[in-house]
Amino acid sequence: MSPHEVRSIGMKVQDRVRAQFSWPLESDRESAMMLLQSVNSLSSKIPDWTEEERENSITSLQERLLNGPIAAVGAAVNSDEILSALNSDHRFIFADGSIGIIQEFENDIREKIWSKTLALVTDADGHPYISQAAERKIMHILHAHGDNEEDWAKLVKEISEMKAPPRLILTHQTPDRIEGMLNPGGFTDGDRTICLIGFLGVPIPQISLLGYRSDIVGQWSGATDPERKLRKLIFMQEVIDRLLEGAPK
């Protein structure tokens, strides 16, 4: 499956989600453009946030992804899954609040996990756990959608005021081509993580999925309405199923 096929699958589900929840595409567009403008306006004082450096961050992440086994971490992850992946030399990309699992470990193991963490995929609602990633300068894959403007604005302000802000890659969920942003496909932070890894060239069957469940709201989910979240998780599972069905056997 090519990177563009991965994105196509993920984007089709985005369209279905908007229809299911009656969310206007224009709201997604407005949020994306506002995030882009906000980050661009701060790039004069944060050189790593310029459009050129954000492109370099994509290239750097892609190179690291292709340099060994990779695990995508979802909100229902448990400690045993993390330890097993760590022992088999996986690197990690965490989906939003799932990064909170790291605090469950003793300090030496915690440090090993942080050293293997490549990025955090977030729509900025995974507090308080995502703050730890910023403090560790973990690359943020920051997403804009129609109802998270306040969340991403708060996060951008918080990390822009840090002495050493993390590097950023910006994502959106519109069908438009937006210079300085990506739409790798996917809807929740969890399936967007998988789509991103696949879009950057890792074959879908080679991605280890930790903590991906659609029957429960995971322990590490951000602030959310449980009933609504379960409806969203159905679409996450659809993305995963379609990616696996389309992957070469």
Regions from the PLM with identified roles:
Residues 1-70, 80-83, 217-249:
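N-terminal donor/sugar-recognition subdomains of glycan-related enzymes
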Residues 1-5, 91-118, 226, 233-241, ...:
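Charged/polar interaction segments and conserved charged motifs
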Residues 71-77, 96, 182-192, 204-220:
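Glycine-rich anion-binding loop/nest that anchors nucleotide
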Residues 169-170, 206-211, 249:
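A structural signal for short, well-ordered beta-strand segments and their strand-loop junctions
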Residues 49, 56, 64-67, 90-91, ...:
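Acidic/Gly/His-enriched mid-domain segments of enzyme catalytic cores or analogous surface patches
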Residues 112, 130, 161-162, 181-184, ...:
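Extended interaction regions within the primary functional domain
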Residues 85-87, 133-134, 199-204, 238-245:
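Short, surface-exposed, charge-dense and proline/glycine-enriched linear segments
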Residues 83-88, 95:
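Glycine-rich beta-alpha loop segments
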